Structures are given as structure tokens and as C-alpha cells.
């Protein structure tokens, strides 16, 4: 029985998106039916542009084509993420900005290390986070815990779901009020207590905060009077720092109350994603917002 051309040959790699074959008799190499040439080059150029951080000018020189041709290939490439939503997940969420009025809110499963959802936003709002959680639940994924940065009103927005305040963000808030090197003895002591936040438990931490408040109670109540007779608290920033800790205390140790759920105590799992995104954007400074 005679063999067809493909039966008497074997695959011999690819060339510009086309399958190559080698004849077993005469050793001649030939190409099969042409594949999707545009899609092949669009994917290749996109990978160089995003993963290898090559600029459009560098791509023009590498592929010996004009600027509009490279842009055409980039615009034609369609990124279609496929997300396999788990039956349940802890969600770490935060928003990072690339410039004023342009940011991305990311919802990530830190235990499986996958991004469940991302939304392009102008501003960080409660509605964005509520919408994101609703969308994840709508996909059949039960949210068993949330880790966030403690934006005002966020804790009460998800009844029935344990919410963990990012301890790193809490430390940043205190540093913003007290500075990295506080001068007042009360500030020095409070900052030292806050530094133990990630290595202690709620009972011990609360005890130290209460003792600090008792010790510096009169100091915190000191007033300064203006020439008009109006008064204000002398140590406003110190008062703001302790108020922040007191308000967030119920959510700083949520992860210890649900040990079986493996809830992180920070949103640090998003930092690698945010840093990578910003590095890619930085490599292409000056690009249009639509391409950004």
C-alpha cells in the first residue's frame, strides 16, 4: 500500500508559526499549511514587550519593521486570562496607583498565589472592594476571610466574613503620626510597642497599650491656648496614633482567631505583583493611557 506524503514523513519543528516536515525517503524538508502568521508574531512581540521589557523602538530594530507595525501587532494581541476559581478562598485586596487617577484594585488568593480579580480604578473606594468581593462570590467562590489596608468603613462592609487589618499598614500609620524617630518619650514608647505587633498576641498587645494609656493619660490631655482663647490638644498626632490603634484593635489579630483558615496578617502577597507591574510600566514611560 502506498503512503501519503504525511505518512512517509515526520514532524521537523516549526518555522515562523508553520509546522515543518521531513520526508523519510528523500530527506526533503517542507512546510505544512500556513498557520495563523499574525497571531504567532503578535504573541512573540507581546512577550518581548511585556516580559522582556523591550521598548517599541527596540522591537522595531529587532524585527526590522516600522513603529506602526509593532503597535499594530501589540494592539491585535488579545490577553484572555483563564481563572480557575476555587470553592473557597482568603482574599487579600489592595489598590496600587501608576499615576494620579489611574490604579488597579487587585483581589488575590495568597494561599494559592493566584489573582482572582482586578479592576481598573480612578480612586480607591468602598464600592470597588464591595463589587470585587461580590463578583468573586458570584463565580461560586466562598470568601472565608479578607485582608485589607483598613480603609475607613471597610471593616463593616462585609458582615459574616472575618476581616484582618494589614499589620504592616497599621505600622505605617503609626510611623506617619510619630515619624520614624519620635522625640517625645511617650512617642518612643508607643512606637516600641507597635514594633511588636507582628510577633505578639491580642491579649499581650492590648495590655501594653492600656498600660501606656494609663501612664500618659494626663500628658495626652494637655491643652494649648491660642491668643483668642481657643484651645486645642497639644499632642494631636500622638492622640491620633493611639486612636488609630484603639479603633483597629478588633481587626489586628483576626488571623489568630481563625488558625484553620490560614489568614495572612499583612497584604504583602500583593507587593510582588505591584512591584512587577510598576517595573513594566516604568520600562515604557510615555505610552498612551490606553496602552498603559
Regions found by a protein language model. Give the residues of each.
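Short, conserved DNA-binding cores of transcription-related domains
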Residues: 1-34
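RNase H-like nuclease fold core
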Residues: 15, 29, 65, 69-152, ...
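Acidic/histidine-rich catalytic cores and adjacent linkers
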Residues: 20, 27-28, 32-35, 42, ...
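Core catalytic machinery and nucleic-acid-binding channels of phosphodiester-processing enzymes
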Residues: 22, 67-72, 161-166, 284
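Residue-level signal for the short linker/turn that defines the boundary of a DNA-recognition helix
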Residues: 53-54
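Short alpha-helical "recognition helix" segments of helix-turn-helix
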Residues: 58-63
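Conserved beta-strand -> loop -> alpha-helix junction used to position metal-binding or nucleic-acid-contacting
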Residues: 145-191
